[in-house]
Amino acid sequence: MNKAILRFILIALFPLLLNASHSILKNDILKQEVSQRIETMGKELVAKTGFHAYVIATNEHFPVGFNLVEYTKKYEAKLDKPYVIFVFAPFAKITQKTQSTGRVGIIPSSKTFAKHYDYEGVRDAGLDVISVKDKNTIEDKHNIGVLQAFSELADNLASSKNVELESTLPNDTGNMVFVLKILIYFGSLLVLWIFILRPLIMRIKNGNK
């Protein structure tokens, strides 16, 4: 092959090779900046732990009860084990009656490997971002939610091997939700004390005089 032609082909393919995706199996939703950040976290996770985390971000309109585990099996042959796949399908139907949509799946290569992360913690890290009412567009919320959930997943996997990752994100939303829960709990106790317990104690004291 002519060297000039070969050089042209290599130059044309270089951007594709540079952006070759390891952690993202399917992407219908994520912006390039988010995809690159996920790739960075995924590569650091593999380098430090040998664990693999993958993302499927799809705009497919799955029907109610669609089996996400079966859906991911078509990727299984090319995946490195042990692995976890984070599936984000915002247009998947949840119930037929309400027509509500949006499903998340976190699918490990084995039940044993599932012990290396907190399913609910990873799920909530993404959903908490998406459900917050703010000025962000739904597209931006989807991107931030997937990024935050993947970061939480990577941190969970790394922590299970006593490793700390440098490329992951602080879960500010998770911390905010935790603080809000504490405030709500404290407020409930305060209301209970002011309107029920304190008057009851005062009546008992006055009755004993």
How does the language model describe each region?
Residues 1, 20-21:
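Absolute protein N-terminus
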Residues 1-8:
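Positively charged n-region of N-terminal signal peptides that target proteins for export
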Residues 4, 125-129, 206:
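Intrinsic disorder/low-complexity segments enriched in polar/small residues
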Residues 8-16:
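Bacterial N-terminal signal peptides
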Residues 21-174:
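Folded, non-transmembrane soluble domains that reside on the lumenal/extracytoplasmic side of membranes
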Residues 166-209:
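C-terminal single-pass membrane-anchor helix
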